[in-house]
A protein has these predicted regions:
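Sec/Tat signal peptide C-region and signal peptidase I cleavage site
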Residues: 24-28
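Bacterial N-terminal signal peptides that target proteins for export
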Residues: 2-13
Length: 163
């Protein structure tokens, strides 16, 4: 009985260590990508981030989106940037949600859509992005009350798309 109990106590520890062993290499790869990006080595950054992004890492997805938006190591492509932002946004990444709002505000890769922009700014603000409320409030000066009502409704009803 004592052996079984000891085994049961060790199982959670082994499980936690297994998870940590999986997460630490992913974080190390992401950090290696950030270090490369910060020194202007965009090819290395993209090589580190792409597999992580494809595996669902929201930070890597946002970083790939930003690379496509800025043309860092890849041709500038707002559509591809948006695709990566959407993947990260679906996981609650507030930076990606903010950038989706910016793209909708300024028509980067999509037609200007103030209602959609307001929606994304609201979602980003709800997830803690400190810049989103200011962008959202500035946008209200360009919107009708009906547009604001619709945008708030969309933000309340927004649910991440499941793959």
């Amino acid at each position: 009985m004592s052996d079984n109990r000891s085994l049961l106590l060790r199982f959670p520890i082994a499980l936690v260590l297994s998870i940590v062993c999986l997460v630490v290499p992913a974080w190390a790869d992401f950090k290696a990508g950030m270090d490369a990006y910060n020194r202007g080595d965009f090819a290395t950054a993209l090589r580190e981030w792409r597999p992580l992004a494809e595996q669902g890492n929201a930070n890597a997805q946002f970083s790939l989106g930003l690379s496509y938006e800025n043309g860092d190591g890849v041709p500038r492509d707002y559509t591809k940037a948006r695709q990566w932002y959407e993947k990260a946004a679906a996981q609650g990444d507030a930076k990606s949600q903010l950038y989706l709002g910016l793209q909708s505000s300024f028509g980067q890769g999509v037609p200007v859509d103030l209602v959609q922009a307001y929606m994304w700014y609201s979602i980003a603000a709800g997830n803690g992005n400190m810049h989103a409320p200011g962008y959202r409030d500035d946008l209200t000066r360009q919107m009708t009350p009906a547009q604001i009502t619709e945008a708030r409704k969309r933000a309340r009803e927004w649910k991440p798309k499941t793959p």
